[in-house]
């Protein structure tokens, strides 16, 4: 038993140091892991503190850039410790406090536009001015964008190992631009762009970058012509079609190729000959027609009639499928058009100078228009208002007496329409002198004497039957009552009456001119407004004779005021009347008119038939 117990106890003693070694190894690894974790934690904390410190420094720089009197050296030094986001915050904060967004500018923002886009008539482009609103000028906007593009986009806490950029500032001599251009339409794709897509991308990038260099003082660009495929929608399918055609042509043989080349050569020759023609040269028309006739004669001599028809159809199809399409204008033709426009401008200037040299033509036209207007305005009511209510009876009395002396007893029985021409002419003389006759002034023809006699007999018969008790009220009375009820119409209200609207327009135009003319008379517009309104009510106004220029309204006001002065009690030889006359003379001289011209307008309302 003792023998068996010895080795087991020895094994236990040998296993004890192994366990202790394992425990010591685990303790060492755990301590190493703890040290690494603490070290990483310390490094992470240091990195976070560094990041926070750099962010705090960047925010402090942003606050400093909000102040005024920023120098160029300080701005370039600050660019090393901020990002583009920080700089955009500077621009926004400065615009909020009504300062220009460019830190070097000390000006304040004025009236900020509310719209989002701006159309530039100089560059014919549309700009997004959302960012431009934060700056006082186009130069400050471009200078700010120029500086912002140089700021590194990397985080500020990893720039210690990087090379600091050399900042440059935009000089004041360089011009700015209005904002970010809005691409309204994409550029047309050419066949060369399909073959070389990288070249097209470079062109697109250069065109997009060139939009930022558009200045507010850009000059007009020259027109340039370009050659594009004639069929734009099918431009992508041109190359496979050409490939298939080439295969078919190889199979068909060289004969078809030679014919096709000959037709293309004739088309090219014709286009070259047409290119020699000009729009303004009539001498070269014959020279342009002769080569065309030669081409036609050659084709007709070499082919029969059906072949010529086929050739014409093929040529038309070639023109429809041709790859030559002019877009824009070449520089040569642009210069030609500029010369033509310069000639037209010279012609227009010569015409304007001739008008200035001959003011008599304009004066004659002005007086003609005013005479036509005043003649159309004048009515019998106008003359009654100016010369009294018995104006018409006084004028018609002598003519009526002459008519009565010529009448006999037999003339009373006959038709009066054939025996009263003088009376009717005298009654319609004023209306016939006008260029038109309104429906209100038209006079109905007088009924014949026989018809009047028959109507009186019928009325007497009805009266007798009524008193005898035989007359019965029939359907005629009810019909007349129904017709009266049906025909009753209401007059138009002032807001919808065209005549009232026209009178209001005339009064408004005269009210703007008259206050200056009433100064010599020492009266106000309110003193004569009632008489003026009553005078305008008598006019015959249309939609055409109330449209005049300011100078014409001034002359019309002078005519009407000279007509109203007797009604207002202002005598011509009084002191006020003499002052008013001198004032009108000076005013007419400024309008290059004479007193006789004003008298020729006022005489339209004068008449020889005055009341006794």
UniProtKB/Swiss-Prot annotation:
Residues 193-204, 307-317 have a biased composition (Basic and acidic residues). The keyword Coiled coil applies. Pfam families: RPAP2_Rtr1 (PF04181). One of its GO terms (biological process) is PERK-mediated unfolded protein response. Its EC number is 3.1.3.16. Residues 295-305 have a biased composition (Polar residues). It catalyses: O-phospho-L-seryl-[protein] + H2O = L-seryl-[protein] + phosphate; O-phospho-L-threonyl-[protein] + H2O = L-threonyl-[protein] + phosphate. A zinc finger (RTR1-type) spans 77-160. It is found in: Cytoplasm; Nucleus. It is an enzyme of class 3 (hydrolase). The modification N-acetylalanine is found at residue 2. Residues 246-258 have a biased composition (Basic residues). The keyword tRNA processing does not apply. The modification Phosphoserine is found at residues 9, 216, 433, 480. Its main location: cytoplasm. GO terms for molecular function: protein serine/threonine phosphatase activity; RNA polymerase core enzyme binding; RNA polymerase II CTD heptapeptide repeat phosphatase activity; zinc ion binding. Keywords: Acetylation, Coiled coil, Cytoplasm, Hydrolase, Metal-binding, Nucleus, Phosphoprotein, Protein phosphatase, Transcription, Transcription regulation, Zinc, Zinc-finger. GO terms for cellular component: cilium; cytoplasm; cytosol; nucleolus; nucleoplasm; nucleus; transcription preinitiation complex. Belongs to the RPAP2 family. Associates with the RNA polymerase II complex. Interacts with transcribing RNA polymerase II phosphorylated on 'Ser-7' on CTD. The RTR1-type zinc finger mediates interactions with RNA polymerase II complex subunits. This is Putative RNA polymerase II subunit B1 CTD phosphatase RPAP2. It comes from Homo sapiens (Human).
